[in-house]
A protein has these predicted regions:
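Generic alpha-helical transmembrane segments of integral inner-membrane proteins
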Residues: 13-25, 29, 64, 68, ...
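Hydrophobic alpha-helical transmembrane segments of polytopic membrane proteins
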Residues: 206-231
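Periplasmic/extracellular loop-to-transmembrane helix junction in inner-membrane transport proteins
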Residues: 29-73
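Generic hydrophobic transmembrane alpha-helix motif, especially the helices
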Residues: 99-135, 142-143
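Transmembrane alpha-helices
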Residues: 126, 130, 163-196, 227-228
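Transmembrane alpha-helical segments of polytopic membrane transport and secretion proteins
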Residues: 1-15
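Short helix-to-coil transition segments within interhelical loops
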Residues: 144-147, 154-174, 214
Length: 231
């Protein structure tokens, strides 16, 4: 009875300790060198040292700033989708350029942003803006277009103003899809920031991934991966 009641809590709680035990046993039984795969305790010790020295906080802060800046601006730009949904001419004007940019691999655009804006957070934030704005824009267009004409006709019969129609109809209809777009955009924002940092940066968790790869520091790579997963 107890197990059935708390099964959803017990199983996830047991997975991590079991995973760490299997990890440690694998290293000991097969004598895996620590430069290929360090043990859990050794990796945790290196993580603690990074936090104690304060070095890692700089990289976390830079990555978070890039994600936050790019996401906020990307959301604002994504709201252009409302204008595109209301004015067909604007959609026909903007959408082809948006699609062309989005079909291009983001990793191929990162060097351009770095060349134009330098190695600072601006180039990485620009890449985040690019990946964030598209899903929000598309979801906003789809949401507004999904509102039936009968709903608008009813508001006209009630002599509602455009502002009232916007607040009472368009916002409630579009909020769910917009939040869905933001949720998708947040996962892509992390990817955009890390890609930019890996290609060219002075700091950031993506920069640590590249630095760890170049210096064959597996602990640095794994610590960066863990922190990115937590963030």
């Amino acid at each position: 009875m107890f197990y059935r009641k708390y099964r959803k809590t017990i199983l996830p709680a047991l997975f991590l300790p079991l995973f760490l035990i299997v990890w440690e046993l694998y290293i000991r039984l097969f004598h895996v060198p620590n430069y290929l795969l360090p043990g859990p305790a050794e990796l945790a010790d290196s993580m603690v040292k990074l936090f104690v020295s304060g070095d890692i906080m700089k990289h976390i802060r830079v990555t978070m700033e890039e994600i936050l800046m790019g996401t906020v601006i990307g959301i604002v730009i994504g709201l252009i989708g409302y204008i595109m949904a209301k004015i067909r001419f604007i959609e026909r004007l903007i959408m082809p350029f948006v699609i062309i940019i989005q079909t291009a691999p983001k990793i191929s655009l990162a060097p351009l942003f770095i060349l134009w804006m330098g190695l600072g957070i601006e180039s990485k934030a620009a890449l985040v803006i690019l990946v964030v704005s598209f899903p929000i824009m598309i979801n906003e267009v789809s949401a507004i277009r999904s509102i039936e004409d009968n709903v608008y006709n009813l508001m006209k019969v009630l002599k509602a103003s455009k502002w009232q129609t916007f607040c009472k109809i368009e916002v409630p209809y579009s909020i769910e899809m917009m939040l869905s777009g933001i949720k998708l955009a947040l996962t892509q924002a992390m990817t955009g920031a890390v890609i930019g940092e890996m290609i060219g940066a002075k700091a950031g968790l993506g920069y640590l991934l590249t630095l760890g790869s170049e210096t064959y520091d597996i602990k640095m790579i794994l610590n960066a991966v863990i922190l990115l997963s937590v963030i």
